[in-house]
Amino acid sequence: MLKSRNLIQPEDFSIEEIDEILELAQKIIDNPSKYSRICEGKLLATLFYEPSTRTRLSFESAMNRLGGRVVGFSEPNSSSASKGETLGDTMRIVSGYVDIIAMRHPQSGAASEAARYTEVPFINAGDGKNQHPTQTLTDLLTIKSLKGTLESHTIGLCGDLKYGRTVHSLVKAMARYKNTKFVFIAPEELKMPDYIKEAIKGHAYYETNNLDDVIGSLDVLYMTRVQQERFEDKSEYERLKNYYILNKAKLEKASKDMLVMHPLPRVNEIDIDVDSDDRAVYFKQAKYGMYVRMALIIKLLGINED
């Protein structure tokens, strides 16, 4: 049983609780039929105020594969938000209909605000440029499954580190594991925010704008797209969107067992010629997301998985 009934940010769970979720996700991967009816009679609401493919569909697939059902909306114009209904009122109403809620919202901090009004477990499926904790759990499962441990890795994060909520959540989560080192690879305009660097005090980190110089030292390279939707000045986005492009030639400088990860969607930052490389695990990573969300739903609903 998890101590918190909500997941707003990775720190809501202890390392032991995260390990429990990852272990359950692995059990589901190994024997999915065992869990195919465990959420029968349960209802998940997916409330997506912002476009999503992987996160929304993986939540819906997760609940369906557990034997539960899903209701919700995929964009705000199909909800009463378009009529001016407050987030709090929406949460009060929806939590009276369902057993668990997953919400994505473009505003940073919206998840913690929404959770105040729910009477059922609540999952942050991404809030603005703030946090994306279920992606973080997915990333942790990917690293643990393929590297065998979450300790003693050098993690390179490349691209939009200013607006990328996935990297903010991942850095804070990985900083809880021993001997983790970080390399932040970004242009000056998209550097990792100071509040994230402050949160990982005590861990070694290095900042650079040159991927070629550091790729050979990495255990994991986490590529990100430049977040077009966060830019007010579109010319600035156009100038920065292709700042980093990972291709086969660049990969020749990397170690043979480095993992190339990406939260997806990608734009141009990973060339398709990388897809066939054994180190490219981003499609496997996306599939792991469904299993992590299956495990999280089971845990937050307090269902005995045995």
Swiss-Prot record:
Gene Ontology process terms (BP): 'de novo' pyrimidine nucleobase biosynthetic process; 'de novo' UMP biosynthetic process; amino acid metabolic process
UniProt cross-references to PROSITE patterns, sorted A to Z: CARBAMOYLTRANSFERASE
Residues that hold L-aspartate according to the record: 83, 165, 225
Xref: Pfam families: OTCace, OTCace_N
Listed Gene3D superfamilies: Aspartate/ornithine carbamoyltransferase
Signal sequence extent: none
Record-listed E.C. numbers: 2.1.3.2
Entry annotated with the keyword Ribonucleoprotein: no
UniProt keyword list: Pyrimidine biosynthesis, Transferase
MF terms in GO: amino acid binding; aspartate carbamoyltransferase activity
Function, as annotated: Catalyzes the condensation of carbamoyl phosphate and aspartate to form carbamoyl aspartate and inorganic phosphate, the committed step in the de novo pyrimidine nucleotide biosynthesis pathway.
NCBIfam families linked: asp_carb_tr, PRK00856.1
Family: Belongs to the aspartate/ornithine carbamoyltransferase superfamily. ATCase family.
Subunit record text: Heterododecamer (2C3:3R2) of six catalytic PyrB chains organized as two trimers (C3), and six regulatory PyrI chains organized as three dimers (R2).
Protein name per Swiss-Prot or TrEMBL: Aspartate carbamoyltransferase catalytic subunit
Taxonomic path: Bacteria, Bacillati, Bacillota, Clostridia, Peptostreptococcales
Gene this chain is encoded by: pyrB
